[in-house]
């Protein structure tokens, strides 16, 4: 009897029939079939993944039968011989634990604590019994009632789903509640960010007697008042959802925001006729404004159907899933756990695990006896502090499902624990039953640790050790192996279950990133269900009590460290020892920055202590004065240079590690140091960046020794804080900052801020010194500031939107979203969870039963924000998936595309001009990416030179490109045809409509919603509800001069919170693009004004606005059609095909300009006048086969010497001569960047000494393209490649 027949026979005894689900998976060139078999009431899912359907079914049945054997429902002897049934490895010390739903008595690991089926205490409302179903009404179903009450007045984007409690009325209600219950607790404020970018975190915890527990809220704001109001709002909304307080019953007051002047929009009669035909063809309902009477002060009337309601087609959704657990099985024959598929061919397809284990044992014994190199590494490993505890650690792991190991960085826990487990299994003849996942918080640590462990085992990667990170994997053998991976990669793998895994090691659990906290909830439920799975949690030396308690008071093992003493110096010590005084120039620049940031400060009276002015009397007056001159907000490169000179004077060998908060500062400091005479000398100093996005070959350099007499200076983010260990560090310089993501739910503000790191962070960084000898730590904050720092930063789960995590919860079949998150180590506020659920319903990712729709399932598998994923789906429908993929990658990558030279605060004109007349950071990025890709294909050297010339961040370009390719691959795997992903070349020189680019920019409004702003003047813009903000200085649209744009509307990617909010990654969009894709509400207000989302006013015929609004639900239906049958999008039914055509017409930038005269605008790269720089630049020319000084003048933005891409819009040369009329430009005469090859007329370098493309160069010349000669006396000075290529590889980008 075959295994499938056997399973049917077994199920027939209980009158149950197995249910099979088979689907294709994998890319087209490696097509496989995934079969899942379910047998109720068991929630375990048997899986087979093979190259044909028959084998997939057979293997799925075998997997399920193996499960039945493990839980004791079947005896091994009863199973047919060909089934190969096995309960797993011989180490099953806790036999008999069954899957929830099995008939046997399940053994609970966490006695007396909540298990997988129980709702966490944090979300149990008043009068709730603890089960899951009892609070469905209070959490979701009364939301629609609240929405119906005041739909027209819900100007707060979320008020209607939270009992109409808003930022304006919540604080008063909270005060009443506190007085009634005699609560005297008050807000605790924590300053976030440096002085000029100050914001505040407000936290308040109140004990709620009715619930017998404490409810906490943490929210941020630009000042204390704003933060406290947001905090009160979160608390009141939580109390509402917990049935403690009532909904708001008063009248919501509409704030008197700045009223925007209606913007005129008019369409051609031909286009209006096309819209009418589509409406008729799809039978779309249209609101008739002529039947509507608007009172002068009355509320506006909706012109479209409410998109937030679930339509009737979704009412019959999938059956609501019960809370479940990720399926797990120990290593078993014929299964490759790393690829989550069956082994269909080759020797391993038929070899038993016991036979493999014997081979592994013989091999290891032989190596220990005969391999001298292996024995040397063993001796080294025996000297690590953790080696003394090897036996104790292994005993604890074997005897307990969960163990916490706490130890100093460098004690050896990251590299040794997994090896101890694997070697112990191998030596006992069970090596094939050990498959170990080790998670790391970052890709660089996963790769570097894997390489280190493989080296210690004298193996190549891919033998017993491998790694898997985004974009790159080297998998080990299927049995008896260790895989290092990021937490995100492991979470992605969980969709297929965790079959074939014996141990999961989670490193750096103290970092509390959102993925790690998410994984802990999953592992806690898995261990409670499968006690044979072993989980090891590893942490640095911080308090692990919370983690131990969460896992049922699991054992905690302390590993002693091995470090030399580290002497710490604070800012006042450093200034005194270096005798540092800030230069007049740096003081002037500081004042400029402070004046600019005060432009839109929300609270000009918010006084905050400048701790640089707090200095003890024991320091000299000169030191105190110098400290007071330094801003806490900025990193003084002058001070860093003085400190490095001081270290140099000590003549103490050892590497220097500098902690910086982000790539932009790393790059700027690297360029600064390379341009100094001392630190730019590569014979004395090697300056290396350490960042997760740089190429692997460059990452490795930080670990490599340098020649004698050379000092290694490593510029790193907090990646070097705990994730990696660099042995030769003696000096640590700590800027004391970190980059943090902040989220305020009531106004949907996600922002990024550079904040003060916590004391725990600083202690970890200090510990990186002193690995090989006594060390030194230079902490660049005052002692007073250090004392004021928080002990720990807020966990990321409290400051990030939850809808991405919610999608993953549903994809992994973990039950309801709020149920799962209620079991987190520190559950996020219940109001944030509800908002995530409601948002996913509105996006049609969830059906009426809160289960994934086809769209939701697709978006859950895309590693980008769900709105961006939805944008990509429509991009595929409109045939521009390639452009949408690169835009989505750019919006998901928060590193800068362009680099700025020292002292340069805005982009150069030649960088701004990459967007042409499109006024778009996204277009500039696309053009730069396409140019970069062409150079990359010519070789690494040409790529590096090109990036240096254009001022591009080469690492960012690589990441964006890799992410784009991954997104397109995932779309293909989902079934979307390749024809919709054809590459589209963007030519920024074209002044006019580009239909493909126009529809792509329109779709950005959908992907980045609600991030719409309106330009007012200079840098000032208005965002949602007319809140003032600034254009970010790194935007191509930023200028400190008077500029106007063809349209004032912009879509932006992210917000940076300072005293004002700055908008980054901006693209100009047309009014029709905003109405069609950048809105949720279209209303008719008084005086026939059409109002979008309660703040954008348009002068457009109301009937026409209603017709355009009628297309929006049709577009939602089109997305549903595309996700149901992706392969059919090239053969849409005629009505939908006509819809696509008319939407493309509406997205053309000029579509709303019929009969209207609009200003063409004065764009930022065109705004400089000749008088600004003393006349136009000279026409470009060649000199002895090389460019003259200005060449393409990367540093020349024309401010001082004129230049730029032609002050009168001459672009790249009016006569089409490539990148400039004279000299052949970009390959005019078959010669690279010059006339006869290479980068000059006769292949000659970049000026005589390779000195870059000009220091103060004037861009592309005035009207004819040219190369602009700007300032001959500076020829050859500074910048670019120093002395050929000796400025260090990283100077190239």
From Swiss-Prot:
Residues 639-813 form the Helicase C-terminal domain. ATP binds at residues 410, 412-415, 771. Changing residue 413 to E: Abolished helicase activity. Its EC number is 3.6.4.13. Sequence repeats lie at residues 1202-1208, 1209-1215, 1216-1222, 1223-1229, 1230-1236, 1237-1243, 1244-1250, 1251-1257, 1258-1263. Its main location: nucleus. Changing residue 4 to E: Slightly decreased binding to roX2 non-conding RNA, leading to decreased localization to male X chromosome. It is found in: Nucleus; Chromosome. Mg(2+) binds at residues 414, 507-508. One of its GO terms (biological process) is sex-chromosome dosage compensation. Changing residue 172 to A: Slightly increased binding to roX2 non-coding RNA. Keywords: ATP-binding, Chromosome, Helicase, Hydrolase, Nucleotide-binding, Nucleus, Repeat. GO terms for cellular component: chromatin; chromosome; cytosol; MSL complex; nuclear chromosome; nucleolus; nucleus; ribonucleoprotein complex. A motif (DEAH box) lies at residues 507-510. Residues 85-104, 1276-1293 have a biased composition (Gly residues). Residues 1202-1263 are annotated as: 9 X 7 AA tandem repeats of G-G-G-Y-G-N-N. It catalyses: ATP + H2O = ADP + phosphate + H(+). Belongs to the DEAD box helicase family. DEAH subfamily. This is Dosage compensation regulator mle. It comes from Drosophila melanogaster (Fruit fly). The gene is mle.
């Amino acid at each position: 009897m075959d295994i499938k027949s056997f399973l049917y026979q077994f199920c027939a005894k209980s009158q149950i029939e197995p249910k099979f689900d088979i689907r294709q998976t994998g890319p087209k060139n490696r097509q496989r079939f995934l079969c899942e078999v379910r047998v109720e009431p068991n929630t375990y899912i048997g899986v087979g993944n093979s190259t044909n359907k028959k084998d997939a079914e057979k293997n799925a049945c075998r997997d399920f039968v193996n499960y039945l054997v493990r839980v004791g429902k079947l005896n091994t002897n009863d199973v047919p011989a060909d089934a190969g049934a096995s309960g797993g490895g011989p180490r099953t010390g806790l036999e008999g634990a069954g899957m929830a739903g099995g008939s046997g008595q399940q053994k609970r690991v966490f006695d007396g604590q909540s298990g997988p089926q129980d709702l966490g205490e944090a979300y149990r409302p008043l009068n709730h019994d603890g089960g899951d179903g009892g609070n469905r009404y209070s959490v979701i179903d009364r939301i629609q009632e609240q929405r119906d009450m005041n739909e027209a007045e819900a100007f707060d984007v979320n008020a209607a789903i939270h009992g109409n409690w808003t930022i304006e009325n919540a604080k008063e209600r909270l005060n009443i509640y506190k007085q009634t219950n005699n609560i005297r607790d008050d807000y605790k404020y924590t300053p976030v960010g440096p002085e000029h970018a100050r914001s505040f975190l407000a936290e308040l915890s109140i004990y709620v007697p009715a619930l017998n527990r404490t409810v906490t809220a943490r929210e941020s704001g630009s000042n204390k008042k704003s933060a406290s109001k947001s905090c009160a709002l979160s608390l009141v909304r939580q109390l509402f959802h917990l049935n403690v307080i009532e909904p708001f019953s008063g009248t919501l007051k509409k704030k008197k925001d700045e009223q925007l002047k209606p913007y005129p929009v008019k369409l051609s009669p031909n286009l209006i006729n096309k819209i009418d035909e589509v409406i008729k063809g799809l039978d779309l309902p249209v609101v008739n404004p002529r039947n509507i009477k608007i009172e002068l002060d009355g509320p506006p009337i909706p012109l479209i159907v409410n998109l937030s309601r679930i339509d009737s087609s979704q009412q019959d959704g999938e059956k609501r899933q019960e809370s479940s657990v990720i399926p797990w099985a120990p290593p078993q024959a014929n299964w490759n756990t790393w690829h989550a598929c069956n082994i269909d061919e080759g020797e391993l397809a038929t070899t038993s695990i016991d036979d493999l284990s014997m081979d592994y044992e013989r091999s290891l014994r032989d190596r220990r006896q005969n391999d001298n190199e292996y024995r040397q590494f063993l001796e080294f490993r025996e000297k690590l502090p953790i080696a003394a505890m090897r036996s104790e650690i292994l005993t604890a792991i074997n005897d307990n499902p969960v163990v916490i190991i706490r130890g100093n960085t460098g004690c050896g826990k990251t590299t040794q624990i997994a090896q101890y487990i694997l070697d112990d299994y191998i030596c006992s003849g069970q090596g094939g039953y050990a498959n170990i996942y080790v998670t790391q918080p970052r890709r660089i640590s996963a790769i570097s640790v894997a390489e280190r462990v493989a080296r210690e085992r004298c193996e190549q990667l891919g033998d017993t050790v491998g790694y898997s990170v985004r974009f790159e994997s080297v998998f080990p053998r299927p049995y008896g192996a260790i895989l290092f991976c990021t937490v995100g990669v492991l979470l992605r793998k969980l969709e297929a279950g965790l079959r074939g895994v014996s141990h999961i090691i989670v490193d750096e659990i103290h970092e509390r990133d959102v993925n790690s906290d998410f994984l802990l909830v999953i592992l806690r439920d898995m261990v409670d269900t499968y006690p044979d799975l072993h989980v090891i949690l590893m942490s640095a030396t911080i308090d692990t009590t919370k983690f131990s308690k969460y896992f049922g008071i699991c054992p905690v093992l302390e590993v002693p460290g091995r470090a030399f003493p580290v002497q710490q110096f604070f800012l006042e010590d450093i200034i005194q020892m270096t005798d540092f005084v800030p230069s007049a120039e740096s003081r002037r620049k500081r004042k400029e920055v402070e004046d600019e940031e005060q432009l839109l400060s929300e609270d000009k009276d918010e006084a905050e202590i400048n701790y640089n002015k707090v200095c003890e009397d024991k320091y000299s007056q000169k030191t105190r004065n110098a400290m007071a001159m330094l801003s806490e907000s900025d990193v003084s490169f002058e001070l860093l240079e003085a400190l490095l000179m001081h270290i140099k004077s000590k003549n103490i060998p050892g590497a220097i590690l500098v902690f910086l908060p982000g790539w932009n500062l790393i790059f700027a400091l690297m360029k600064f140091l390379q341009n100094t005479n001392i630190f730019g000398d590569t014979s004395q100093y090697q300056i290396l960046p350490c960042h997760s996005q740089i190429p692997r070959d460059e990452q490795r350099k930080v670990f490599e020794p340098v020649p004698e007499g050379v000092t290694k200076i490593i510029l790193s983010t907090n990646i070097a804080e705990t994730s990696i260990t660099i042995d030769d560090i003696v000096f640590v310089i700590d800027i004391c900052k970190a980059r943090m993501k902040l989220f305020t739910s009531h106004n949907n503000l996600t922002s990024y801020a550079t904040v003060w790191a916590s004391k725990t962070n600083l202690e970890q960084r200090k510990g990186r010194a002193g690995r090989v000898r006594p060390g030194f730590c230079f902490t660049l904050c005052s002692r007073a500031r250090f004392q004021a720092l928080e002990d720990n930063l807020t966990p990321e789960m409290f400051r990030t939107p939850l809808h991405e995590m919610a999608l993953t919860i549903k994809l992994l079949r973990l039950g309801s979203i709020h149920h799962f998150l209620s079991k987190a180590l520190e559950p996020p506020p219940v109001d944030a969870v509800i908002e995530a659920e409601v948002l996913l319903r509105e996006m049609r990712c969830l059906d009426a039963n809160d289960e994934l729709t086809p769209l939701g399932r697709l978006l859950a598998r895309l590693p980008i924000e769900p709105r961006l994923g939805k944008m990509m789906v429509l991009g595929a429908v409109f045939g521009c998936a390639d452009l949408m993929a690169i835009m989505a990658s750019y919006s998901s990558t928060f590193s800068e595309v362009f680099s700025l030279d020292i002292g340069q605060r805005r982009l150069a004109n030649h960088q701004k001009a990459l967007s042409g007349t499109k006024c778009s950071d996204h277009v500039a990025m696309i053009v730069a990416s396409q140019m970069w890709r062409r150079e990359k294909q010519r070789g690494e050297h040409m790529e590096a030179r090109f990036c240096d010339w254009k001022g591009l961040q080469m690492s960012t370009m690589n990441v964006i490109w890799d992410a784009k390719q991954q997104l397109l691959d995932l779309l293909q795997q989902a079934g979307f045809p390749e024809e919709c992903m054809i590459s589209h070349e963007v030519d920024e020189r074209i002044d006019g409509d580009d239909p493909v680019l126009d529809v792509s920019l329109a779709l950005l409004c959908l992907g980045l919603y609600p991030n719409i702003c309106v330009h007012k003047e200079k840098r000032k813009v208005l965002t949602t509800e007319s809140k003032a903000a600034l254009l970010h200085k790194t935007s191509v649209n930023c200028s400190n001069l008077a500029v106007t744009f063809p349209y004032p509307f912009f879509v932006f990617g992210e917000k940076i919170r300072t005293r004002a909010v700055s908008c980054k990654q901006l693209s100009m969009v047309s009014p029709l693009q905003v109405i069609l894709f950048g809105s949720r509400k279209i209303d008719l207000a008084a005086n026939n004004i059409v109002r979008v989302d309660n703040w954008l006013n348009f002068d457009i015929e109301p009937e026409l606005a209603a017709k355009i609004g009628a297309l929006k639900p049709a577009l939602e239906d089109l997305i549903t059609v595309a996700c149901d049958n992706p392969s059919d999008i090239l053969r849409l039914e005629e009505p939908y095909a006509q819809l696509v055509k008319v939407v493309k017409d509406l997205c053309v930038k000029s579509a709303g300009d019929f009969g209207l005269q609009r200003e063409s605008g004065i764009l930022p790269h065109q705004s400089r006048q000749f008088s600004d720089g003393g006349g136009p630049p000279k026409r470009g020319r060649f000199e002895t086969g090389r460019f003259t000084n200005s060449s393409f003048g990367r540093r020349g933005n024309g401010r001082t010497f004129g230049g730029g891409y032609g002050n009168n819009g001459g672009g790249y040369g009016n006569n089409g001569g490539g990148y400039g009329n004279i000299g052949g430009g970009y390959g005019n005469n078959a010669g690279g960047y010059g006339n006869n090859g290479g980068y000059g007329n006769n292949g000659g370098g970049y000026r005589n000494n390779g000195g870059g493309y000009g220091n103060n160069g004037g861009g592309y010349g005035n009207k004819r393209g040219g190369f602009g000669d700007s300032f001959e006396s500076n020829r050859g000075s500074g910048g670019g490649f120093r002395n050929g290529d000796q400025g260090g590889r990283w100077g190239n980008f």
